[in-house]
Design a protein with these regions (language model features):
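Post-BTB helical module
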Residues: 95, 101-214, 218-255
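Short, conserved non-catalytic motifs in the polymerase core
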Residues: 73-86, 119
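Intrinsically disordered, low-complexity acidic/polar segments
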Residues: 52, 63, 224-225
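A generic structural signal for short, non-catalytic loop/turn and secondary-structure boundary residues
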Residues: 36, 76-78, 241-245
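N-terminal BTB/POZ boundary and linker segment
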Residues: 2-60, 87-113, 196-197, 201, ...
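Short active-site loop/helix that positions an aromatic residue
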Residues: 57-71
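Residue-level signal for pocket-adjacent positions within structured domains
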Residues: 27, 65, 78-80
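Intrinsically disordered, low-complexity boundary segments flanking structured domains
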Residues: 27-31, 68-73, 160, 185
Length: 256
């Protein structure tokens, strides 16, 4: 996988022509990242708490996450704001911070597992462009890896609404091979939005009665107090299941 850099880009308007020289700009900002003279933010990452000395203006305008964190971060005796990211590996953050400063993505030597975890970190930092890029890399060049871990990938993608492309990729597969999802051990732990996204599709290759059986199974699992035998249920038990499946039931009525 080759690294990505923003190169020279041209556009023409009705009035004039402008030339955008991004590569030099990118290189200059990467030099700024290495410049330790004017930093005003200290970020610690990884188990070893490696320190990154960075600049608040760059972080604030490149990432909504850092914009919010900087607003509440306290200053030390040297007037530096401190942010603790010890749950993020140093290797991951080195890639993230180079993207934030220079718009470069250096992942050519990384495997699919690392790229997937990096994508989740990019989601945390609300870096939409980077998330989209990493999604594309996984789907286009690591689809076999995704398929081998399909249940985990599916569940994770629907736990984060930023992963729209990955959600669609997963649902396209489930529409053709529904047992891949419905027969998985993790099915009952899937989020409601995943179930809803499938019911909304008109190309799901499964009979409605069978889909409904799985929906009931999922609904029961969301209520730990419910027995798997409906004949033993009280009126309160039925009401609890009805409340759990309220949104899903409305979709069945609408798409029927």
């Amino acid at each position: 996988m080759s690294s990505r850099r923003f190169l020279v880009c041209f556009y023409t308007s009705n009035i004039n022509m402008a030339t955008k020289l991004f590569e030099r700009l990118s290189n200059d900002y990467l030099k700024l990242l290495d410049d330790k003279e004017d930093f005003n933010v200290i970020i610690s990452t990884g188990e070893s708490s490696k320190i990154f000395q960075v600049h608040s203006n760059v972080l604030r305008y490149r990432s909504l996450y850092f914009h919010n964190e900087l607003a509440k971060a306290s200053k030390d005796e040297n007037n530096h704001k401190k942010i603790n990211l010890n749950h993020i590996s140093t290797q991951q953050f080195e890639i993230i911070i180079k993207y934030i400063y220079g718009g470069v993505i250096l992942i050519e030597d990384q495997d699919a597992s690392f790229i997937f975890e990096l994508m989740l970190v990019a989601c945390e930092f609300l870096l939409e462009e980077l998330v989209k890029y990493l999604e594309t890399q996984l789907i286009e060049t690591n689809s076999s890896w995704l398929r081998l871990r399909f249940s985990h990938i599916y569940k994770t993608s629907f736990q984060n609404n930023q992963l729209q492309d990955l959600q669609k990729w997963c649902n396209d597969i489930v529409a053709k091979y529904p047992d891949k999802l419905f027969e998985s051990e993790d099915f009952i732990s899937f989020p409601e939005n995943a179930l809803i996204s499938l019911i909304k599709r008109d190309d799901l290759q499964m009979e409605e009665k069978k889909i409904w059986d799985y929906v009931i199974k999922w609904g029961i699992a969301q209520n730990p107090g419910l027995s798997s035998d409906p004949t033993s249920w009280t009126n309160e038990n039925f009401l609890a299941l009805k409340a759990t499946l309220k949104t899903v039931c409305l979709l069945f009525a609408f798409f029927k």
